[in-house]
Amino acid sequence: MRLPIFLDTDPGIDDAVAIAAAIFAPELDLQLMTTVAGNVSVEKTTRNALQLLHFWNVDIPLAQGAAVPLVRAPRDAASVHGESGMAGYDFVEHNRQPLGIPAFLAIRDALMRAPEPVTLVAIGPLTNIALLLSQCPECKPYIRRLVIMGGSAGRGNCTPNAEFNIAADPEAAACVFRSGIEIVMCGLDVTNQAILTPDYLATLPELNRTGKMLHALFSHYRSGSMQSGLRMHDLCAIAWLVRPELFTLKPCFVAVETQGEFTSGTTVVDIDGCLGKPANVQVALDLDVKGFQQWVAEVLALAL
């Protein structure tokens, strides 16, 4: 039985790898994609997502989502992904268009139509998910769980303590973590370990057309290097769905700092239970790196 999932994303080069895995992993049934502003503007993330769907010739509905965070000015990660978000490969022109409704409403409608609760996967800022939970609370029983790439129990990657997806919209993340839905958090504690080695990266052009495309994108990706290895942050959320045994999780109380001058966007992960609050998030703290790398090689070999 394939696991039905909806994927909220902000492509983004490592998003492209995660999308490939979500499409081609035989255990998963990707039924809906939504985009959000994050790595680049939502217009660019939508264009990039549609280009990928056309590249793989798959008919998965896609809805464009939030262009700005809930309350603050947008920030991006163009320094990591390039100005377009997916520079390095010349995609074929197409005439695909997103659905005519906002992402959070598309998620709501699809949840309400689904015969069973659906797993949501969010690998960008959590703006769309916060809008869904705040504007459509009736949807909560139809969400099996939310798996996110975001946060950290330790250091950050865009400030000393904050990870980009959370820092891009801290108020949205705070809303989601307070919501009461089941959450699995794949943060920097594991994603910084999720490295594709130079030896493997060198094999991609001969793997298949997806390998050629990803290799071209990776030459513009700044989360590591082709010589030292590349971190596959977003792919961890997909990997957990398929191979949860590769991850060490701990239930923790997690809150998001929204006020601090230097700490805004920090995920406060109470690993030792100091606050005495009930756990609201399953936090991934360690990764079987060899197992992860083997799984990536297996799933990308299935891509077209």
Swiss-Prot record:
Enzyme class: hydrolase
Database matches in InterPro entries: I/U_nuclsd_hydro_CS, Inosine/uridine_hydrolase_dom, IUNH, Nucleosid_hydro_RihC_nonspecif, Ribo_hydro-like
Recorded GO CC terms: cytosol
Keywords, comma-separated and alphabetical: Glycosidase, Hydrolase
GO function term, MF aspect, one: purine nucleosidase activity
Function: Hydrolyzes both purine and pyrimidine ribonucleosides with a broad-substrate specificity.
Stated family: Belongs to the IUNH family. RihC subfamily.
Name this polypeptide is given: Non-specific ribonucleoside hydrolase RihC
Species of provenance: Escherichia coli O1:K1 / APEC
Phylogenetic classification of the source organism: Bacteria, Pseudomonadati, Pseudomonadota, Gammaproteobacteria, Enterobacterales
